[in-house]
Amino acid sequence: MLTLENFKEQWERKFPDISLKHTHFLLAVSGGLDSVGLTYLMHLLGAKCTIAHVNFQLRGEESKRDEQFVTDFANRLQIPFKVNRFETAAYAETYKMGIQQAAREIRYAWFDQLMKEIKTSIGDSNDKVVLLTAHHADDQVETVLMQLFRGTGLHGLTGIPDFRNDSIFVCRPLLGTTKNQIRQFAKEYSLTFVEDSSNEKNDYTRNLIRNKLLPVIQEVYAQATENVLDTVARLKEAEVIVNNTITAFWKKGKKTRHGIETISIQHWKKVKDNHTYTWGFIQSYGFKPQQIVEVHKLLDASNGAYIATPTHRFIKFNDTIQVVPNNSNTEHIMVYVGEGDLQTNNGLLHFETVDAANMGEMNKEAHFAYLDADKIEWPLLYRTWQSTDYFYPLGLRKKKKLNHFLGSLKLSPAIKQRIGVLTMGDKLLWVVGKRIDDRYKMTDQTKSVLKITLLDRC
């Protein structure tokens, strides 16, 4: 049974860090039973709320009816509300996606915007802004069954999370409450709501499971919903244990040097036949489960072989796999002054101009550069090297392709990819941390020196 008291108890158990008193809640309200019930519960608790209703304009007069119902409902409870209408079908066609995906993108983008507006409106207050949705136990069971039949891992079988906090903070306080319990609560408080006729159509997989499959299952297993929820709870506990074990395993095989994460291939091969270990590591780098076999093949590939995702590259180098962000080769930073600091992906560059006569002994380590300041024209540009770059390495009188120069240093592909250069127009002054250009070195005629130091190397 759903009561105000047990709802509050569940809240304090599930969301101990989210104060009902010091949080502003954005309520996603369709006008259906579930969102009306949740809204009324928050109203009875005296929580600070704003109602948000999205009119997707997909059901003609019924969509208009829902919008009017939510408007009247919000006014009756004296809760601030926002309504927005979207051309969902046109959005789906423009971006070549299904209606359900389009509706999801539209509503969460708008919710994100509203939450930022609410946060701005409350000013210096420390109150959190949290989105509440009315997903309930029946939704949870449907989701788990859909994941199971599609094929999934342990995480997929844990269903809908009680909360998530990525781009926006979302809580689902009714996940442990069945639709029948919400219906009884609504009846007790004489709450009215609207029915979405599309829920009766079996055009979507979820509706088929809800309308056709679950009733048959419940004829055989009367406690099916409760049993699935209990199983989900146990699987969530098991997932924590599995994740901790996987994290500990990879921690033993990983090192970070010069900002490059490297994994021992010998260590990886201990679990090569266990896809769960590999997936536990690679999923956060943009891989898909279908790529696990491809990643395993990389362990025995030739030096320099790699697999790329939209965010990272996994590169084979000797007895390691190196993990490099894809954006590491896009750095471009203008340098406008002759003195000061410049933060780069490879470390901090410190610039200073000194009198050649008073400079003292030069430090010959590679992370120091001494250039003839009178030959320098500002601004300079710090960027990642390119395949078309060339320069005159210190000590040589002829130009050399930078690609060939870096190749002679026997650098790993990951480190080579991240090398930065300091340029003046189309002239390369310094391969940072490696070699300056001979044309800009100090000479006996040098009066002023631009000294550059690479500090805090990544």
Q: Each PLM stretch: what is its role?
A:
Residues 1-215, 244:
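Core alpha/beta nucleotide-donor-binding catalytic domains of modification enzymes
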Residues 200-206, 227-236:
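Internal, active-site/partner-interface "lid" segment
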Residues 211-212, 216-228:
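Conserved anion/nucleotide-ligand pocket segment
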Residues 150, 154, 179, 218-222, ...:
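Alpha-helix boundary/capping and short turn/kink residues
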Residues 78-81, 109-112, 158-162, 198-199, ...:
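Short, surface-exposed, polar/charged, turn-prone segments marking secondary-structure boundaries
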